Swiss-Prot record:
InterPro entries: Exonuc_VII_L, Exonuc_VII_lsu_C, OB-fold_nuc-bd_dom. GO terms for molecular function: exodeoxyribonuclease VII activity; nucleic acid binding. It catalyses: Exonucleolytic cleavage in either 5'- to 3'- or 3'- to 5'-direction to yield nucleoside 5'-phosphates. GO terms for biological process: DNA catabolic process. This is Exodeoxyribonuclease 7 large subunit. HAMAP family: Exonuc_7_L. It comes from Synechococcus sp. (strain CC9311). The lineage of its organism: Bacteria, Bacillati, Cyanobacteriota, Cyanophyceae, Synechococcales. Bidirectionally degrades single-stranded DNA into large acid-insoluble oligonucleotides, which are then degraded further into small acid-soluble oligonucleotides. Keywords: Cytoplasm, Exonuclease, Hydrolase, Nuclease. Heterooligomer composed of large and small subunits.
Amino acid sequence: MSAESLPSYSVRELNNAIGVLLERGFAPRFVIQATVSRPQVKKGHLWLTLSDGEASITAVAWASKLKQLDFVPADGDGVTVIGKLNFWSARASLAVQVLDMRPSLTTVLRRFETVKAQLLEEGVIDPSRHRKLPAYPNRLAVLTSVPSSALADMLRTAQDRWPLSELLVVPIPVQGEVAPIICGVLNRLAETHHQLGLDAIVIARGGGSREDLMVFDDAEVCRKLATFPLPVVTGLGHEDDLTVADLVADHRAATPTAAMVTLMPSRESAQQTITQRRSRLSEYKRWRLEQANSRLRDRHLLLDALRPEVTLQRRRDQWQQRQQLLRALSPQRWLNRGFAMLNTTNGQPIQSINDISLNEQLQILLKDGVIQAVAKTIQANETSNSKTSP
């Protein structure tokens, strides 16, 4: 093959031709999944190597784009990159220009487990630290992005369930490298919650990928939530999404809307509770009134019993009863019935022949007089062991 039949290029022309072929023959945008190695910032630009274990390529995020990224990778992180090819003809250098970059799910879950283990060891994740939520909150702070559909749903739910509660909406970024901003907001709320009259806070983010919730796996954000002076409720992502922030919160709700349902009593249940308590209060009042009336009746009876005329009548009745008893037991009653009483001369009753002696003077009492007598003989009954005189 003769050299005259082949295309002839200068180095510059060759590199330019290669650049044209790449620009025309390759996709203007593409997605690449890779592992990051040797990331470093030079003059505001992020340079890194993307590899998959078999091949590697240089990538760059220009300073203007780097400021817009929600995620800056560390060495060993898995990433999903949206990019395009950059070819520098002067030195025939090829690189992927990063247009967007997000962590892979593997990276997110690895960070989740790392931070979870760290906070478990520190005692920050501890169910025994969880505090009771207010039953009827007066004022709540809602930390979420503004505007957002999640916030709209939360406001609507709060209005439907318990319009008496006031919501203080605190805008925060909820995605990307925004942990310092969230920590700053939490610090300010912790310092001013008394003045603001807050009862609890809600930190929420609407649905998205698990990768979008990575900021809520940040260790410092989670420490701030765990030590916040008021109860904390999280409503982050979807029901299946679990972040470290959910583990340190006093209550984890599946969604932002569910967070409001958790904190806000429903008007219907509150009305039912009020009705039940009113009924119990009425029953209690009736019972107390009956008890008071019963005590009053008892005291009236006691007062009646202590009146002088009542006391006098009671004593009169007792005296009459005793008189009747005395009359019933009086010897005169037996004398009136024909019996006689035998006494010694000094008036001692004689009940047995052993109480007298022969020739002893006796008194025989009858109903209408006394007979003086002398004991001439003393004769015992056949069954008696008493003495007998001749």
